[in-house]
């Protein structure tokens, strides 16, 4: 069972909210931090992208008449808040962590510089990439894909509420069928909403595998990182 050298972990903003639908649950963040810390302690280099949907969603705001660009910028700032929360939890465990923001805010986070990010990873620091791509109209899934490609990660670890990719939402349809593996093209052609089309296409074009797994099962981040077969592989 071979593990990975470097992973990019994609967490939704909702993952930090715990049982709530909004905000940040400190206990949940600490629990996630412990799992990520265990992976880093095993020698695997870890980059993280956190969404911002527990605080603000630009797309939803645009649907309610707010300017889409303004909404997306607000969503990017929400990811910075989440990134700082996760960073704080990790630092309190003694894990060296760096938050790197695509939007410069020097008092809060380092500016994102690719070579510096790679150097942090090589030194064993966890790097949390904040503020998306800094551009509106791009999701944090796309930001995760971009950062994974830039740092030459071996895989994108997409943590979700379900244990893989299904032909339809298993939380709504008990008869949903799980795919142990699936191609990028089939994800796109079926319109499966595991990640947005831009990020799937980028992974396809660059042959970057995605593993979709259940974040709510304790230990799954480590299992996935060590190469254990869990969830669904998109390749």
Curated annotation (Swiss-Prot):
Regions crossing the membrane: none
Catalytic activity, reaction form: UMP + ATP = UDP + ADP
Residues reported in the UniProt entry to bind UMP: 52, 72, 133-140
Cellular component terms (Gene Ontology): cytoplasm
InterPro entries reported in the protein's UniProt record: AceGlu_kinase-like_sf, Asp/Glu/Uridylate_kinase, Uridylate_kinase, Uridylate_kinase_bac
EC code(s) of this entry: 2.7.4.22
Protein name per the record: Uridylate kinase
GO biological process, one term: 'de novo' CTP biosynthetic process
Regulation: Inhibited by UTP.
Matching Pfam families: AA_kinase (PF00696)
Subunit structure: Homohexamer.
Binding-site residues for ATP, renumbered to this chain: 10-13, 53, 57, 160, 166, 169
Protein family (similarity comment): Belongs to the UMP kinase family.
Gene encoding the protein: pyrH
Annotated PANTHER family: URIDYLATE KINASE (PTHR42833), URIDYLATE KINASE PUMPKIN, CHLOROPLASTIC (PTHR42833:SF4)
Organism: Solibacter usitatus (strain Ellin6076)
Localisation per UniProt entry: Cytoplasm
Keywords: ATP-binding, Cytoplasm, Kinase, Nucleotide-binding, Pyrimidine biosynthesis, Transferase
Annotated pathway: Pyrimidine metabolism; CTP biosynthesis via de novo pathway; UDP from UMP (UMPK route): step 1/1
Record's function text: Catalyzes the reversible phosphorylation of UMP to UDP.
MF terms in GO: ATP binding; UMP kinase activity
